[in-house]
A protein has these predicted regions:
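C-terminal domain-boundary segment and adjacent tail
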Residues: 1-32
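Acidic (Asp/Glu-rich), glycine- and aromatic
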Residues: 55-59, 138-152, 157-206
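Extended recognition/assembly regions associated with phosphoester-bond processing machinery
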Residues: 27, 39-40
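Short, surface-exposed beta-strand/loop "edge" segments at domain boundaries and coil↔beta transitions
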Residues: 42-44, 62-67, 137-149, 173-177, ...
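Short acidic-hydrophobic surface loop/beta-edge motif
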Residues: 34-38, 202, 218, 229-231
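Beta-strand-rich recognition/accessory modules
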Residues: 16-19, 26-28, 163, 179-185, ...
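Acidic-aromatic substrate-binding/catalytic surfaces of carbohydrate-active enzymes
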Residues: 42-141
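Broad, structure-driven detector of short, well-ordered beta-strand segments within folded domains
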Residues: 40-47, 147-155, 227-246
């Protein structure tokens, strides 16, 4: 090394996000996962669930989390999550309420399809400091309408957010309109057991301001033209929010209850053929 015959890996190593698009080859399932990690978050995207975010750690809070004898965390050194499909289940436990996940639903004439039920594959690219996941289009079949939809997910270095873009590529009836519901179900913690949610505040900012102080009453509020929907979680010093590209979209927040304590943030919008709708999931330190 000192003679210059070999390159020291550490001297050339840059501080940049770590990411990996992983495909299962061990069991031959052909499933794909994408992991992204930077100083603001760690996230996992599951292509077998239509590009849903199934793991999210809000590093933006920069928690002090002492571990060991004499601290509040004698053994548990895990950083708290907002979404975790193993400990907080995921889409496939919705029979018991809702598991934690960041996904979207399409509705048409009383029928509803969650993109978690639309397995696909993704391709990775990078433009400047933005890592991009481009998912293969999925076809959603309603009783009398077929919709072809493509998802792109953007991870911009240093932005502390994830942009998710839905593009309606084709409809069997070009004049039809469907309702797109972009949602995030979350519940903080480090284990499968729920933490106390009673100090969480859910809020909608926009033409009308709505606030829910968490009391496990399963309440919901919505505002058309919402600028932002958010949740503040004091215990982990985290503020998580969603914003949308369309100023006319309806933002909503939903409170959980004792046996399904997760909160929900989301946007609903009527969308038509060839239309694109984007939302951002934003993470910040609460104070």
């Amino acid at each position: 090394k000192f003679d210059g015959a070999i390159e020291d890996y550490k001297t050339a190593l840059k501080y940049e996000p770590e990411c990996a698009l992983w495909r299962d080859i061990l069991y031959g399932s052909d499933k794909q996962l994408f992991w992204y990690c930077d100083p603001y978050m760690r996230a996992c995207v599951n292509m077998d669930q239509g590009g849903a975010i199934v793991d999210l750690r809000p590093y933006a809070a920069k928690l002090e989390w002492p571990v060991g004898i004499g601290t509040k965390h004698v053994q548990d050194a895990s950083y708290p999550f907002l979404i975790q499909e193993k400990y907080r289940a995921g889409y496939f436990t919705h029979y018991a309420g809702e598991g934690t996940v960041r996904s979207a639903k399409l509705s048409y004439k009383g029928e509803e399809v969650d993109l978690c039920l639309c397995p696909t594959h993704a391709h990775f690219s990078q433009e400047g400091k933005t890592r991009i996941l481009t998912l293969d289009p999925v076809t959603i079949e309603f009783r009398d309408l077929t919709v072809k939809l493509q998802t792109k997910e953007y991870f911009e270095e240093g932005s502390s957010n994830i942009k998710i873009e839905r593009n309606i590529l084709e409809m069997s009836d070009p004049t039809a309109e469907v309702t797109l519901n972009e949602y995030m179900v979350a519940c903080y913690g480090t284990t499968e057991y729920s933490e106390d949610m009673s100090h969480i505040t859910l809020k909608i900012d926009g033409p009308e301001e709505k606030t829910i102080n968490y009391e496990y009453k399963c309440r919901e509020e919505g505002v058309v033209g919402a600028a932002e929907v958010s949740a503040v979680i004091p215990e982990i010093e985290t503020r998580v929010s969603m914003t949308a590209s369309d100023a006319n979209a309806e933002g909503y927040v939903k409170e959980g209850y004792a046996f399904s304590p997760m909160f929900t943030l989301g946007y609903r919008k009527t969308i038509s053929d060839k239309e694109v709708f984007a939302t951002w999931l934003n993470l910040a330190k609460a104070n």
